[in-house]
């Protein structure tokens, strides 16, 4: 199953363009769903208006023994296509960070992500520039280092390039800088053909 997930991530160059050379192991399925809309299925297109409120997220490990009650998880959401897939002067844009998500299994064997942990950066719904093509909105679930004090994690005070000041910087840098271990991923695509946004960059 993990190889199938990696294949779908590779289909739209998610690994090449975001996590790059990071070593990782997909340990389960990261499920993302928005109200009154289709579930996110590793690359399906979504209407922009359906994604403005924070989604419901859960994680279902392939093997529960790989995550213990002592572990804490972090969720990241990023847009590597800002302002477009061919122009990266604003990328990546940080859309969401939650840390300290507890590993607590529900009746169905999944771990609830929504409503858990500490929100470090509030959810920002997709708002790509008009006629800039499809943007990839990528969710990463990571395991925090055991015993880590997440208050010392990098503070993302500027969502453009995750505050690193270099076009193309983002989730990769945050994961590496805070010694996180990538264990799950999902993504969807949004295109804006109707709304002119005024960006204060």
Swiss-Prot record:
Source superkingdom: Eukaryota
The organism of origin for this protein: Saccharomyces cerevisiae (strain ATCC 204508 / S288c)
PANTHER family: CARBOXYPEPTIDASE Y INHIBITOR (PTHR11362:SF148), PHOSPHATIDYLETHANOLAMINE-BINDING PROTEIN (PTHR11362)
Any one GO biological process: regulation of proteolysis
Family from the record: Belongs to the phosphatidylethanolamine-binding protein family.
Any one Gene Ontology molecular-function term assigned to this protein's record: phospholipid binding
Pfam family for this entry, one: PBP
Gene3D superfamilies per the UniProt record, alphabetical: PEBP-like
Gene Ontology CC: cytoplasm; nucleus
Additional observations: Present with 6230 molecules/cell in log phase SD medium.
Name of the protein in its database record: Uncharacterized protein YLR179C
CDD domains: PEBP_euk (cd00866)
């Amino acid at each position: 199953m993990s190889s199938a997930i990696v294949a779908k991530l590779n289909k739209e160059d998610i690994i090449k363009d975001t996590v790059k050379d990071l070593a990782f192991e997909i340990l389960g399925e990261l499920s993302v769903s928005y109200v009154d809309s289709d579930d996110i299925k590793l690359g399906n297109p979504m209407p922009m208006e359906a994604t403005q409120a924070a989604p419901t997220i859960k994680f279902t490990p392939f093997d529960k023994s790989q995550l213990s009650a002592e572990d804490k998880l972090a969720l990241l959401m990023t847009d590597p296509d800002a302002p477009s897939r061919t122009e990266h002067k604003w990328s990546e844009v940080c859309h969401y960070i939650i840390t300290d998500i507890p590993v607590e299994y529900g009746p169905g064997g999944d771990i609830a992500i929504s409503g858990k942990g500490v929100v470090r950066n509030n959810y920002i719904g997709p708002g790509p520039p008009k006629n800039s093509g499809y943007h990839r909105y990528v969710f990463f679930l990571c395991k925090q280092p055991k015993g880590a004090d997440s208050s010392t994690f990098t503070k993302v005070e500027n969502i453009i390039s995750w505050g690193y000041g270099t076009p193309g910087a983002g989730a990769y840098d945050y994961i590496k800088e805070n010694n996180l271990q990538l264990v799950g991923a999902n993504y969807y695509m949004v295109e804006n053909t109707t709304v002119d946004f005024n960006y204060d960059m």
